[in-house]
Amino acid sequence: MGLAITLWLPASGYAEPASTTNNTFSESAELIRQTYEEQLFTLPAFKEGHYGLRMYRQTLDPKYSAAVWSDLARVASRLNQFSAEVSTAEQVFLYSEQRLAGYFDDADERSQLRYIATKHMPEYLYLGVDLLGSMARANEYGLKHKEDQLLRQVIRRYDFTKYATDEEMIKAWAAQLANQVYWLRQLGEQDVVQPFIDSFRKTYPDSADKALSAQQYGNKLYGMTHIIFADSEYYQNPIKEQQHQWIFDYFRNNIDTILLRAKEDVVAEVGITFLLAGLEKDPVVEKTRLAIQQAIDKKKGMIPSTSGVFDLADGEHRNVLAIMLLDWQKTNQAPTVKNNPKVFSSLPYGLIRQ
């Protein structure tokens, strides 16, 4: 079925045309876009960069260059700190123990799972959660840190297979591990993508879905969407459905359950995976778009949290995903220092060209 699924039938009995449906989706996206872009530079650097980078990759609009540069500065600052202060085995241990302690007092299910799974391998919090993401982002920009070799030596001291194939780690960090195994491959380091996917599927067999808590069901879905997002290098490259057929089949077969059980972030991500594969006319896209459109508070111009809170920073993730789902443009390998030099007219200290 195409995108022209009937939204409603007016009194005349004629269905609303597809073009009108598409217009309402893009109008809903514009409502959120206005809300965020009027106050974008009040957000923390990570949130500002997260939003700006995704919008730049979708549109190539130079108005997002400042937000991208904010992300660039954040990455440089992190890598400067890591190369100067967290490179020896002892430094990694002390840093990681401090990071781990941050999960101890949190009583929510996710934090407890993360603490229990990671307490015996705390270095993961440094390697996977902090270091790899910053190195991969610099790499995407066509850059690297001036101490790149030192940082790579740190990564090479550890076998990432231990984290990526551990069932308890997958239950705690599915989406993050999906990102990290693809980042490792992107950086030309260890390739544990397939062992991770195999372990993920064993950890979350479809037959066990009904036994999963809401948090664990969400973790499974996040892991699946992030396998595709990471493979696309975060909305830079199109995806071939056949390469991840098991994921697309699952989403198609379970979309109604997903709409009932999942948070808006996940629903939007599911729809975007189909857009990355060029499947805009798949019924899953229409269903996710309708669900996300209905979740928007028109007065506030954004999607609130599940508890009804309207916080720009906390809600940035779900709302930028909503914009992308409702008004999808296309994938672009951008920005890079070679192809978009104006974005990188000055580099923050520590970053150099590859």
Regions found by a protein language model. Give the residues of each.
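Amphipathic alpha-helical protein-interaction segments enriched in hydrophobic
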Residues: 261-269, 313-320
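Terminal, non-catalytic domain-edge segments
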Residues: 14-88, 92-107, 123-142, 149-161, ...
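Eukaryote-skewed repeat-based solenoidal scaffolds used as protein-protein interaction platforms
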Residues: 110-267, 275-278, 286-289, 293
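Bacterial N-terminal signal peptides
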Residues: 1-8
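Membrane-interface motif at the C-terminal end of an N-terminal transmembrane signal
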Residues: 9-13
